[in-house]
Amino acid sequence: MKIRLFAPPIVAAFFVLNCWAQNAPASTPPPNSFLDRLTSLTDSDSRPWTAEQFATMGRIRDAAMTDPNAYNMLAHLTDNIGPRLSGSLQAQAAVEWVAAKMREMGTSVTLEKTTVPHWVRGKEDAVLTRWPGMPPGTTQKIVVTALGNSAPTSEDGLTANVMVVGSFAELRSLPVGEVKGKIVLFNKPFDKELTAQGFGLDAYGQNLAYRGVGPSFGGSLGAAAVLVRSLGGGDFRLPHTGLTLYGEGVDKVPAAAITAEDADLLARLSKQGPVTMRLTLTPKTLPPTSSYNVIADWKGSEHPEEVVLVSGHLDSWDLGTGAIDDGAGVAISMQTIHLLQSLNIHPKRTIRFVAWMNEEFGVSGATTYLQEHSSELTYHIAALESDLGCDHPTGLSFFGAPEAARYLAPVANALAPIGASVLTRSDEVTAEDIAGMVQLGVPGLSPSQDSRFYFSYHHSAADTLDKVNVRQLNENAAVMAVTAYALADGSEAIPRRK
């Protein structure tokens, strides 16, 4: 359930008050009237922040919009270090670089050890060797990429007929044995209309199960391999990778994503007659290895034991360079600390930066954090994560108590000059690394980003630095930094779910 609250609330309040004043009788309104409740929104005595703190929010916001540091850090992370698949040399280099940068900012840095899988992509090739109307002696290439955690084919590949289905239900309804030995394609189109309306994450969620468990489901019915239509809205004949999981006791069959264009091609050809494919995937699953969450504390001036956490995940997929997923989230979270340092601002509570390791391949970094800090969660005032790219932020999404809306209204008002004043409450936590904390009662927040374009590039070779708009990146940094400061310096903590 998502509830959108229109903002800036104080501007709305003044508008309603003005209309009321023009038409109201001269008599004094009764206590606790609608006017009283609206007036309370503008009563500074009822807020956790003073006028000076509001001014500081403005300073942070304005500095974020002109400071090039967020983009410069993101450029180094993506261009110089590159893709950061869990277990890779690049992932380790990223850990060391981020830790060094945070030490330069004057934070107390901890490397928190966690165990990560080590899966390595190999050869990827798919060709049609038979289809209706094929010219003799020809083949037809299909653009394919292995899903993370996929089992391999043999080095020579496997050749089998392709079976196209639109849903789990359709595959389940087929006669027993009909799936055996086939290459199954789950062809569920990505909802571009929903995405164009700004609900890309919802469109993604509708199809996620096909990538996540489709190969396991197909394997349980005897499929030789499973293909999924890429989860993305781009029409560039680029496949989108992502993690797949196998159930216990089920044969681990090779699993790959193909482009939307190729999925449509196979669907059309299959209606005309048999289609045969030779599929070659040679990934390797190596023994698990060690990596690290990077934790950096900007110590609180009065209550250092109380923590406001800002975060993004440091690992990425290996097809692109992980600029929007989630180098941007890491960079804008680092920028929160940089801005506080450069402006010499020391909030009452500690602001903790975390670069999560292994979000893409099983969230082991976040799991380790929960285990290591379980006794401290009472003192975690809030947890923020950015993991939906860095297009224009419309405001804040918060996961938790409905009462937090009134608490956050002044913060949204401080973000109104950059068009980021809408508050949205959601019962569903969409930020994976902080989800465990939120379930245990820690208030969670994320920038609400325009997701119309994000899934065109997500998990694909097109996730590169050129997709980042510098101004919009800075807007996201402003949202993260202003919110973190407000939560860390307020006289009251944000309400927790009861």
Annotate each language-model stretch with its function.
Residues 7-18:
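Bacterial N-terminal signal peptides
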Residues 29-49, 53-55, 75, 79-196:
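Noncatalytic luminal/extracellular "stalk/propeptide" segments of secretory-pathway proteins
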Residues 48-88, 238-243, 315, 387-391, ...:
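N-terminal capping segment at the start of a domain
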Residues 56, 130-131, 143-176, 244-323, ...:
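Soluble metallo-hydrolase cores and metallopeptidase-like ectodomains found primarily
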Residues 57-65, 79-89, 160-165, 174, ...:
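Second-shell loop/turn segments in exported
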Residues 72, 338-364:
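Short helix-loop-beta-strand segments that form the rim/entrance of peptidase-like active sites
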Residues 155, 160, 253-258, 263-264, ...:
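Metal-dependent peptidase/peptidase-like ectodomains
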Residues 338, 342, 455-498:
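His/Asp/Glu-rich mid-to-C-terminal helical/loop segments that flank catalytic regions of hydrolases
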